[in-house]
Each structure stands twice: as C-alpha cells, then as structure tokens.
Amino acid sequence: MDDDDDSCLLDLIGDPQALNYFLHGPSSKSGSDDVTNAGYSAANSNSIFANSTNADPKSALKGVSDQLGEGPSDGLPLASSLQFLEDELESSPLPDLSEDQPFDILQKSLQEANITEQTLAEEAYLDASIGSSQQFAQAQLHPSSSASFTQASNVSNYSGQTLQPIGVTHVPVGASFASNTVGVQHGFMQHVGISVPSQHLPNSSQISGSGQIQLIGSFGNQPSMMTINNLDGSQIILKGSGQQAPSNVSGGLLVHRQTPNGNSLFGNSTSSPVAQPVTVPFNSTNFQASLPVHNIIIQRGLAPNSNKVPINIQPKPVQMGQQSAYNVNNLGIQQHHAQQGISFAPTSSPQGSVVGPHMSVNIVNQQNTRKPVTSQAVSGTGGSIVIHSPMGQPHTPQSQFLIPTSLSVSSNSVHHVQAINGQLLQTQPSQLISGQVASEHVMLNRNSSNMLRTNQPYSGQMLNNQNTAVQLVSGQTFATSGSPVIVNHASPQIVGGQMPLQQASPTVLHLSPGQSSVSQGRPGFATMPAVSGMAGPARFPAVSSASTAHPTLGPTVQSGAPGSNFTGDQLTQANRTPAPVSVSHRLPVSASKSPSTLSNTPGTQQQFFCQAQKKCLNQTSPIPTSKTTDGLRPSQIPGLLSTALPGQDSGSKIMPATLGATQAQPESSVGSSPSQTAVQVDSHPGQKRPAAKQLTKGAFILQQLQRDQAHAVTPDKSQFRSLNDTVQRLLSYHVCQGSMPTEEDLRQVDNEFEEVATQLLKRTQAMLNKYRFLLLEDAMRINPSAEMVMIDRMFNQEERASLSRDKRLALVDPEGFQADFCCSFKLDEAVPETPLDRSDQHRSKTSSLHQVPRAQSRDRAKPGMAEATNHDQFHLVPNHIVVSAEGNISKKSEGHSRTLKFDRGVLGQYRGPPEDKGGRRDPAKVSRCSPGPEGHRKSLPRPDHGSESKLPGVLASSHMEMPCLDSFQDKALRNSPKNEVLHTDIMKGSGEPQPDLQLTKSLEKTFKNILELKNSGRPPSDPTASGAADLDFPSFSPMASQENCLEKFIPDHSEGVVETDSILEAAVNSILEC
C-alpha cells in the first residue's frame, strides 16, 4: 500500500459507508472485513495471529497496527494495501465471520479510532527509521511487514482462530519475514541478529499495555520496531524465509529462523534459502500460568545476504522499572527458582556491535515484584542485562550473578546469559574468537537423569528444561572473548531432587579464562547459589576459553565425547568455530563432590549424582578451590573436554574413576562447598585462580532455604538409598522454628480440646433431648400427626385389601379360612402382627379375645410395672404410646374423663392416670378392653375383653386379672354393644362417621359398668371398682400410649379402618411383650 492509499484509508475511516465499500467492495462480503476480522474476528479466539490461511504479514501488520493503536499512518508506508487485504480476505474469509454477518460499522469505527496521533507519530518514526519497502524484496523486513503478528488489543480471539491459551498457533506469517533471524524459543523472543547497536527502543511510555512484543530489526542499519500489545498467549510465531509454516501445527511455537549461515540457531550448518520451521512444544509444566508476555522485544537478525556479524543484544539505556527496557517475562520458567534482582551484564565481544556500556537491557520478569535492579556494567562489557527475578531475593554480590534460572554468572567476564522462559538469551560476540567457544558448541543441558544429554536434536536449539533449568541457546555464540561459556543444567529436580530447589541449573560450571582480564572478574563470581544449590552431578562446568585460549583445546572441547554427560550439544560443532580453551584455563568444577570430571557413562553419573549432591549439600565449608585447580591440570582439561567437555562431575566421587582422563580429582571438582559452589579454573596452568568470593552466613542460610524449597517443590521420589540420604531429604521438612511446647502449652491445648469436646457432647445431648421431646409430644398428640395419618392410611388400605381377600376366602372355603385364620391369629399374636384380626373385626374379635387373654396374661406379668392395683402395663405404640392396663377409672363424665385421659394419657404413661384420666380411659379402655370384648363380642359375646384386634395389639396388654374384670367386661359388653364399634372406632379409627357418638355411648356404658363394679363392692385396689377392671386392664389407665392410641384411633375412626391401629399396636406390643 502506498502513501496515497494510507491517506485514503485515513479519509475513509471517518466515512463508514466509504470504508465499508472500500473494504468489502460492491460484493459487500463481510468475510472480507479485514479490520473487523483483524480486531474482532473471533471473540473466542486466543490466537494473536491472524488465521494462517489469510494471515499475511501485511494483513497481520494492519491488524496489529489497528489493535495496537499503531494503525497505518500516512507516515508509515505499508507493504500491503487494503485492497490486497480485501482480496486476500475475500479469497479466504476468516472462519468466524459468515458472509451474511452484518458489517458492524460501530466496531470498525471504534477499532479505527485506536489510531491516535501518538501511534501515528510512532509509526512515522518507525517508517523513518526503517528502510523503504524495497528492502522487503530483499527479504529484509519491511517496517510495515515487520509486524508478523496480528493481534487484537483486547480481543481474546484473533482472526477467528481459537487457540489454547498456552498453545502456540503456528501461523505462517507472510513471506515478508523471509530471512528474518528472529528466533522464538520456549515462549520467549530471543534477541538475535541486531547488528546496529545504535538502535534504541521507543520510550516505554510509548508502549501501551502490560504485554508488548517489540520487534527490533536492523537491516542495513535501519532497525525497525513493532510493538504488539497484550500478548495474551505465548502464541508467538516468527516466520523465517518466505515459506509459510503449516498453520495447523499445534502445541508449539513455530519459529523460522534463517541466519546467514543457515539456521544456526537450530544448529543447521547449511544455510538454506528457506528457513526451517522449528516447533518448540510448550510443556504445560513450563508455564505456571497462561503466558502473559510482557514487553518482549525481538531484534531481527541480519538479512541472509549480510555478513554474519556478532549478534549482540542492543541494550537500551537502562530505565529502571520501565518496560521500555528489554523486558522479557519468564513465561515458561517457574519463577520460584529464580532469584530476585539478579543482574548480570553481558560483555559484548570486542568486535561486538557498539553498545554503550550505559545501555543495559533489563529483562524484567513482570511478576509480582519488579525491583529495578541497577544494571552493573561489567568491565569492558558493552551493556548489562538486568533480570529481576520474581523471587524478590536480595541481590547477590555483584561479582556473582544468578540467572533467574539459577545460572550464576559473573557480571565481569561472562556474557550475561538471560534465562527467559527457561531459555538463555545470549549475546553473540561479533565474531567467534578462538578463545571463545561458540555458544552452540558450549550449550550443555543437564538431563533430568543427571546426565548431560543433547535434549535438542539441533545444537543451536536451546535446551529447555521443563523445570526452571536455564538453558543456553547454542544457536548463538554467547561467549565473548574472555567470557566463559555457561552450561545450564536441567531443573534441580532433574538432578535427583536433591539439588537445592532454587538452582535449577546450579550445575553450571563456569570456566574463567585466566588469560582474559575478564577472567579475573569472573573468578570472583561464584556459581555459588546455583552450584551450591545443585548436586554435583547437576553442575556442568561451562567451558569458555579466553580469546587467547589454546586452539588445541578447542578441538577437545568440540570433541566432547558422546559418552560425556553433555548430551546437550556436546559441543556439537555445527557452524561452530572451534572454541579453543586454553589449557591454562581450568574447568571450574563447582560440581558437588564429584570432580568436574564427567563420567562417560551416564548411568554412573546418575548413580552417583544423588550422592555427590548430598555431599555437596552436606558440605558447608567451601572446599579449597585450589584443589580444583590442582585437580584440573591443563593436561587434564583436554581429557575432560574430550570425554566430558563440561568437566561436570558425575555427581559422585565414584565417577571420577570411571571417567579416566576426566577423572580429575573429584575433590578438586567439588572444589567448592555447595555454599562456595563457584569453582574457577586457573587462567594459566600454573596459576591459581582467584579465591572464590566467600559467601556470607546470610547467603548460606538463603542457599539452604532455597535448596529446601527446591526439594519441596520438586521432591526426589526415588527410594532412600541410605540413612544419610533419608535424613538429608527429609530433614528440610522437619525444620522447626521456635521452642518446644511447654507444659503450659500442653495444658492449654488440653483445655481447648476439653472445651470443644464438652461443647460437642452438650450439643449432641441437646439434639437427643430434642428428639426425645418431639417423640413425647407426638405421643401426647390427641390428633395423629400427618406422618401417622399417612401410615394409618396405608395400613388401612392394606387391611381393607386383606379383609376383602379373607371375605372371598371365607365364602369360597369357610373351613379352610377358619383354620388359616386361627393359625394366622396365633402367629400374629406371637409375632407382633395381628393384621388379620384387626382386619376382621368379627374374626378378629374371636381371635382377639384369645389374644387378649394372652396379652392380658403378659400384662399381668407386667402389671408389676403399674400400680399394684392398676396392674398398669405400658405398651409401646408406634406412636410412642405406652399402652398400660386401665388405670383408675374416675366417675367423671365420659367426655371430661376422655379429655383428661387424652391429656394425661401421655403424661401419666407409667402411672395410673388420675381417675379423670382413668375414668375417661376406662371407657376408652373398656371400649378397648371390655368393649373390645364387646367388639369381639360381635363374634364372641364378651369373651375376655378380647379387645379389638387393634386393642389386642395395642391394648392386648390389658387383661382382667380379677373375676371382676370378667364381670366388668361382661357388663361393659352388655352395656355397650357399641363398645366394639367404639373400640374399633377409637382404636382402629373405623372411619365410620359414627365413631364419636359410638365412643361416647361406649364410654357411658363403660362408666356404668365400672360404677356397677364399684358398687358391687368389688374391692379393687383401685379407688374405683372400675379400677379393678382397670387393674385387669392395667395398661389402659396409665398408658398415655392408649390415649395416644385413642387419639390415633379417633382420627382413624374418621379414617374408617379400625384394624390399622390395632395392627400396629398389637405388633408393637407383641414385640415388647416378647
């Protein structure tokens, strides 16, 4: 798109119709709605990139610019025009938008409104700083094409592509990225290929949004920058040469990296015109959260045609706490391993691009604590990179630098390696010096098995430790002259979990070339936290040779034996300059006990790894570094390098023997105690390296805490190998703070427990009491509760069905029915069930008469419970009613006595109710007991007060012990033929409408009978003659249960099944009696 188009676009933005027509053309296909698609294409898409099918670097740029508020401006010539976007989008409309979807002018206008003067000015600046679009043809990124990312500023989905938050969409970005050397590793943008140090990032103030990716490309000394705001996911796709990566690649960053030498980043020795896509899968374990990318600055590599120049990070003057500095958020790294405020300055190689020493790159982990750390200029370093670790840990001594991933780097002699997302950004010296080891060669990764293994198929590839291990990207040579190459190990848990947690890569050993002036500074820094944290096996001595390093050693380094633990790139030399390591340099083996010597056998290493580690942990006092120096002789170095370049101790002292040449004295390799993990190699064979910086007591404590934390976070789940191992691994979980509890404390705890237990018991008892009270209330109810009514209805229904069956059976086979009925009645009596009797009032009468005597006999046995005269027995009724023999019957009126009886029936369950109750009860009882007989009388005139079948069940208890009872029953029977009905009604709730009247009549008759008995001079113990009868029916009077039964029965009367209550009662009584 030319400037005219840009101005045209600006004109159109104000006119919705014109814009719509311009964007969609007469076809008005909403699918071609590039702005809408770019900004709002898929509200549900997490991808930052436009759909690969229609995502062109140009369109992507436009979407990004629109979203970023850096929309195309007059000043920014865009390589692609809206017309191109329209064609592209029409040809492949974004999936989320259907053609029939109405075009939302408001959204488009709002989106276009994001283009502000500030963004226009910024674009103009970029345009001015970037070469004309003609460079685009040269595969140099066009400024406009520099934005290969399409991103909606706040829209979760872009280009209708739905991406898992962590997953990276491999969207091929337009061919415009042809030879761009931008590399993305492990969710981080790596600064590569910036040949123009003069490039400065725009002020952080210009950058809006917490997460930004800035692409800084310098082509022909015209760096371009693109800022992407709010990169929600780690989906960053960098496209190398013109080939587009398959859009459907899932689960990884698609990185096309083509360097002049080929994909050196990925270790491709051949420089292919087409960048090779590399997919770096994201491991969910690498991300503690979705990958918020904060201000990632990507520096574009040189054009393939340009000479390969040292790639240096172009640091912007350090702006403390500002994101304008290179801010890289450790997406993949678990920050707990990183230390806060670790600063390390990269030394640019002497030939390195001009970087003002004042310019430092801040890699700020924008997580909880962003402490501005003053970048420390390393001696002669062009700039320093300051990493603020989320740990918030105090800064380590300046001489010592911890990469958040626990690499310890000395600011002075070492190019600072940044662990970002577990990958180290490394500055590359402009040229590899013989003394320098190409980072590719040197990159070593500690395998979880404690073996160095080449985790990545390509040497250039960064080794990503899923844990917090820091990895050097071998693709770039990061060692500057005199700067040691640092090898990073996998996370401490890989080390066997014994390594201190903090140092995922504490295993890194640094060689400080004594020859380089820097080396002295380096000796000063110790890998201390890292090494100390790491078990020996975890440490890899980083081998770096000073620029003066002997070339002969370089081959040895490169020749690192495959057996060597560096599985990592064993110093693979693809595109590597032999990195001669001067023999004079000694590998600093900060490996724990094991000497720096690496056993060729990974297994051995693994075996001893834990032991060495333990030893390291156990060691608190630094081992004389001189040992290391002694142990590692120049002569030995070649062997170490050849066998195990890292000079990594196998992790156990035993390993040295297996190592052979690498068997440099284990002691020496352990040279430093974990606390003094940094072991420095003498610059010269005869020289003794400078003493490692002594750690303070606070540092020791901090290290121990970090190790304990690391063990806790990544515990070693292997079996305990020895008592010491057990103690070492478990002790950190049993560190107690404070004093032992005193007796007072124990008493206090006991008291608290007692209080709680007492309260619990009280609550339990209260609940129990409440339950019992409810039961009592239910028993005292005159009218049955709803539950009982339902139960009675069900029983009544069953009884009716049973009665109908019995009637049919009686008609069909009377004799057989009688025989069965008698047997069943006996069974019912024995068993708490008299349903048939109840069902059949008539039949039940007979049987109930028999039952009643039995029940009465039982009652008589039980009468002792009741008053002697009353022989009151208590029978439990399902309603929790206790049926007792009739108590004293008072002469009070039937209705009054009934009321009292019901009222007091519950109250005086175990005592003969007062005469009122008794009197009332007697009628009831009589109706139940004597009337029961009467009721039964229907079938048998006055048999023993064969209480209704119900009664037998409920009252079955009451038996007339005395002849009076019989006479009373007879009288009752005679007097109240309806008593049966009454009983039936009362007891069973016959459901007849008459029950009340019948009950009243029955009660009257019962009273009369009782009075007659009294008058007859029957001397019942009870005050009333009826009392005798009552005594015979002892269960009646005292039994509130009877009253309850009566209550129940009364409702039952209305219900109309007399037998139901009696069945329940009889069953319960039978059980109780049994």
Curated annotation (Swiss-Prot):
The keyword Kinase does not apply. One of its GO terms (cellular component) is SWI/SNF complex. The keyword Phosphoprotein applies. It holds the Pfam family GLTSCR1. The modification Phosphoserine is found at residues 621, 976. One of its GO terms (biological process) is negative regulation of cell differentiation. Keywords: Phosphoprotein. Residues 889-904, 913-925, 934-948 have a biased composition (Basic and acidic residues). Residues 542-603, 620-689, 834-874, 887-952 are annotated as: Disordered. It comes from the Eukaryota. Residues 544-576, 591-603, 620-629, 660-680 have a biased composition (Polar residues). Component of SWI/SNF chromatin remodeling subcomplex GBAF that carries out key enzymatic activities, changing chromatin structure by altering DNA-histone contacts within a nucleosome in an ATP-dependent manner. Component of the multiprotein chromatin-remodeling complexes SWI/SNF: SWI/SNF-A (BAF), SWI/SNF-B (PBAF) and related complexes. The canonical complex contains a catalytic subunit (either SMARCA4/BRG1/BAF190A or SMARCA2/BRM/BAF190B) and at least SMARCE1, ACTL6A/BAF53, SMARCC1/BAF155, SMARCC2/BAF170, and SMARCB1/SNF5/BAF47. Other subunits specific to each of the complexes may also be present permitting several possible combinations developmentally and tissue specific. This is BRD4-interacting chromatin-remodeling complex-associated protein-like. The lineage of its organism: Eukaryota, Metazoa, Chordata, Craniata, Vertebrata. The gene is Bicral.
